[in-house]
Amino acid sequence: MIKKEMLAMILAGGQGTRLKILTKNNAKPAVPFGGKYRIIDFTLSNCSNSGIDTIGVLTQYEPHILNSHIGIGSPWDLDRKRGGVSILPPHMRNDGGNWYMGTADAIYQNIMFIDKYDPEYILVLSGDHIYKMDYSKMLQFHKEKNSDATIAVIDVPIEEASRFGIMNTNDDDKIYEFEEKPEQPKNNKASMGIYIFNWKILKEFLIEDSELEDSDHDFGKNIIPSLLDSGYNLYAYSFNGYWKDVGTIESLWQANMDLLDTKNPLDIYNKNWKIYSVSPSKPPQYTGPNAIIQNSLVVEGCAVFGKIQNSVLFPEVEVGSNSIIQDSVIMSNVKIGQNVIIRKCIIGSNTIIENNSVIGNSDDITVIGDGEKIKTNSIIKN
């Protein structure tokens, strides 16, 4: 048995239906972000930077791209003989098997994997949020409070609090009540879906919950309320940095645009907290003689002959002469012809946009899926 103080379990099986065609053939955590990343890179990098070297990634919906991206974990220094990263899909057991039926059930189905490391603590994470957090500081808080379960929270506008699970706390941050999406929230401390549990206690509750036919097998709906009802010590750990749930087209687009703000607290350029990813070998970016690039992220392999403003371009995007790209996210290997206008769009990978086309407007966000071909002189405005 390999003893680990704490290991991380990343919930990465979400379908992300609100991202529409962007997750048609792709799990939400594997959606491209920020020119060179995938969403899950932030959670994996947080683990690596926090000194966590044993991670289980729980996959389910369309896992192929995600599995290939993570591989053996080399970009995050997780290619290890003792620990490292393990992909954990639903599987058949002697007593049967099923899809993960909820967040808690996903952990329950992997009790044997966790017990192999005999951890004191288990860190449960979502693989589909954009943020940077030092989990070691959260663990220190957990220990200092002698907590049985610690939940990371972030202050949200009170008018939006009804969209979240809300933690009602005493002055010492001890949670006395949890409300799942309350109609009239008492405060604005929203759960971030980041939990640290004492493993022996959580294991007991997971086993009990698995036997309840009327349970949703969910941390927010079942496990957290049960712990509170049983008198265990639960504390809220406040997080003050940038955090974005990119579960909608609007939030994904906005999070990409946030990277263009020099005052953005996410700061992907911080050398002390790098965001790691798989980095394909591409040639340098080429900027044509009449090209203009303003306030944009344009990465390796791109060839720009037109005008780029307030946009994010992934590898190997080609932009023809006299074309204008504004307020848009252009994913990898997109070929854009001449005299094309693209405004406030998300364009999926491997798409071809032929000459003289107009896509998007300045109001709503227009989304074009992967591998589409937009013919010459097309006009698409949602």
Curated annotation (Swiss-Prot):
Pathway connected to this protein: Glycan biosynthesis; glycogen biosynthesis
Species name: Clostridium novyi (strain NT)
Class in the EC hierarchy, top level: transferase
Job of this protein: Involved in the biosynthesis of ADP-glucose, a building block required for the elongation reactions to produce glycogen. Catalyzes the reaction between ATP and alpha-D-glucose 1-phosphate (G1P) to produce pyrophosphate and ADP-Glc.
UniProt entry keywords in alphabetical sequence: ATP-binding, Carbohydrate metabolism, Glycogen biosynthesis, Glycogen metabolism, Nucleotide-binding, Nucleotidyltransferase, Transferase
GO molecular function, one term: ATP binding
Catalytic activity, reaction form: alpha-D-glucose 1-phosphate + ATP + H(+) = ADP-alpha-D-glucose + diphosphate
Database matches in SUPFAM superfamilies: Nucleotide-diphospho-sugar transferases, Trimeric LpxA-like enzymes
Oligomeric form and interacting partners: Homotetramer.
Gene responsible for this protein: glgC
InterPro entries per UniProt: ADP-Glc_PPase, ADP_Glu_pyroP_CS, GlgC_bac, GlmU/GlgC-like_hexapep, NTP_transferase_dom, Nucleotide-diphossugar_trans, Trimer_LpxA-like_sf
Protein name: Glucose-1-phosphate adenylyltransferase
UniProt EC number: 2.7.7.27
One Pfam family hit: Hexapep_GlmU
Family indicated by similarity: Belongs to the bacterial/plant glucose-1-phosphate adenylyltransferase family.
One GO process term, biological-process aspect: glycogen biosynthetic process
Sequence positions that bind alpha-D-glucose 1-phosphate: Y100, G165, E180, K181, S191
Organism classification: Bacteria, Bacillati, Bacillota, Clostridia, Eubacteriales
